[in-house]
């Protein structure tokens, strides 16, 4: 995994080795803590158990709980446990079709050739597939024949690989390939780990029951208060002043960790504590309160303003009022 710098959701695979050989919950917890993240042990236990049991997994929970980071770390641990060759990160979109996921014909100077999609490419290379924001896809349109494959049956695709005369088939481990096909076999340990914001379940498209049955759902809950305090030791001391905001919204630790990293960099500059606190509030926390009512807006302002000097208090009152869409009273 990348070092704990930068945006958590932007991380991808890295090549340098991690001294881990056992795919277990204790190992995953240790790797997570080394990355500056603390997850409830029962969440990690569930994730490891589900993957060990042969299930694909969807991690759900509030924004900022570190779902994407946990997915990456689990896949990276899988790589160093020889369960996969690596992992392929992607973000789902509403435009996904089977062309993006399974593949399709692509024109070339030599004619039309089959271009594998994300899923087929991951299967062929032995990589686990990590999908962020899965709920943003149209599941039935995007998964297509994968429904059959994920349920343990082989499926024949209407495509042929370059130089082949037989159609491609996707064949789960332990299943006989259909006759007269060019099989692409799913490794026994191949997995999909996807994330879904609990608050976004109603957005764009509803997940069909057919797809839900093919995944284990695991809720990534927020850790206890002591975990936040531990994560914010050192440079994060100023960020601890914003921990009471959790009484207004179930803010995950990743938001606070990102704020701590910003503080670490910004403290090199000539900036007052009041200004710095306002900056991290505006940059990392204010967007999490979109859609709050007037009562919560007043509480939000008061919780932050008591730590600020008059100039930053005025700015905070203004931006909270803009978020509310009307003048802040109280």
Where are these predicted regions, by residue range?
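C-terminal regulatory/interaction module of P-loop NTP-utilizing enzymes
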Residues: 1-330
């Amino acid at each position: 995994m990348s070092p704990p710098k930068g945006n958590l959701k932007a991380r991808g695979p890295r090549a340098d080795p991690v001294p881990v050989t056992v795919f277990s919950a204790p190992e995953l917890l240790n790797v997570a803590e080394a990355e500056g993240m603390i997850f409830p042990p029962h969440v990690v236990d569930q994730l490891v158990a589900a993957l060990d049991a042969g299930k694909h997994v969807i991690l759900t929970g509030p924004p900022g709980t570190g779902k994407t980071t946990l997915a990456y770390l689990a896949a990276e641990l899988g790589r160093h446990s020889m369960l996969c060759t690596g992992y392929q990160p992607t973000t789902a979109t509403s435009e996904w079709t089977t062309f993006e996921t399974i593949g399709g014909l692509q024109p070339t100077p030599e004619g039309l050739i089959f271009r594998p999609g994300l899923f087929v490419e991951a299967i062929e290379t032995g990589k686990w597939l990590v999908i962020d924001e899965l709920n943003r896809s149209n599941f039935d349109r995007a998964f297509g024949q994968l429904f059959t494959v994920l349920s343990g049956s082989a499926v024949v695709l209407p495509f042929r690989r370059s130089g082949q005369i037989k159609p491609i088939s996707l064949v789960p481990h332990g299943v006989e390939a259909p006759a007269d096909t060019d099989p692409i076999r799913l490794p026994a340990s191949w997995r999909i780990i996807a994330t879904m914001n609990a608050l976004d379940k109603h957005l764009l498209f509803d997940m069909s029951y057919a797809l839900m049955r093919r995944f284990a759902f695991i809720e990534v809950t927020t850790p206890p208060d002591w975990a936040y305090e531990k994560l914010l030791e050192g440079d994060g001391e100023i960020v601890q002043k914003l921990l009471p905001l959790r009484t207004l919204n179930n803010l995950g630790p990743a938001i606070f960790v990102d704020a701590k990293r910003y503080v670490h960099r910004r403290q090199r500059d000539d900036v007052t504590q009041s200004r710095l606190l306002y900056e991290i509030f505006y940059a990392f926390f204010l967007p999490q309160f979109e859609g709050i009512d007037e009562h919560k807006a007043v509480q939000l302002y008061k919780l932050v303003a008591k730590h600020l000097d008059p100039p930053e208090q005025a700015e905070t009152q203004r931006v909270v009022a803009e978020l509310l869409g009307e003048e802040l009273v109280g």
